[in-house]
A protein has these predicted regions:
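Charged, low-complexity intrinsically disordered terminal segments
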Residues: 1-172
């Protein structure tokens, strides 16, 4: 997520993430180092890890002149179980649910996706996880491939394939 800020929204989500981590669910979180520069404490990832949540910072802010500082990850990807995912423009802060009136009335959009298309969201997240942890995540990909097929759950014959670009591809 680009912005996470303590408040009603984040505490509600954090409580669920912590509960699921305690139940043995693999809970992972990536937040942007610049987007959360003024909203989260320094080394907030350590607090998350104490709660059982695997947490990494994408491109931590370093106060030096560097073109890479502008490479930011604004994506908001939430994968629940490999079958249900969410994406959209909503950051995890109270102003995005009008609990706090920072920008006036805020209206944003997010979508819930169910089905095999969520695998692409999972792959996008795991790819970025490998980058921020500097680890080989190939075994993670095998562990998170959806193992169920629910053809009766959907009407129509459409096709959904989420896709992405990387904030690290050096495009200007």
């Amino acid at each position: 997520y680009f912005i996470i800020n303590d408040g009603v929204m984040w505490q509600t989500i954090l409580n669920i993430l912590e509960k699921k981590a305690k139940e043995g669910v693999d809970v992972r979180l990536i937040y942007d180092g610049f987007g959360c520069l003024t909203t989260l404490p320094y080394k907030y990832y350590e607090e998350m890890r104490k709660r059982g949540i695997k947490c990494q910072v994408f491109n931590p802010f370093r106060p030096i002149l560097n073109i890479i500082q502008n490479n930011r990850d604004h994506r908001k990807i939430c994968v629940i179980d490999g079958w249900t995912g969410f994406t959209g423009g909503i950051n995890l802060a109270d102003e995005y649910i009008n609990q706090r009136k920072r920008f006036g009335h805020w209206k944003d959009t997010a979508v819930m996706l169910k089905g095999e298309g969520v695998w692409n969201m999972t792959a996008m997240f795991l790819y970025m996880w490998g980058i921020v942890t500097n680890t080989d995540t190939s075994s993670d990909f095998a562990n998170y491939v959806p193992h169920r097929w629910h053809p009766d759950d959907f009407e129509g014959s459409g096709y959904v394939q989420p896709f992405c670009d990387s904030p690290l591809d050096d495009e200007v």
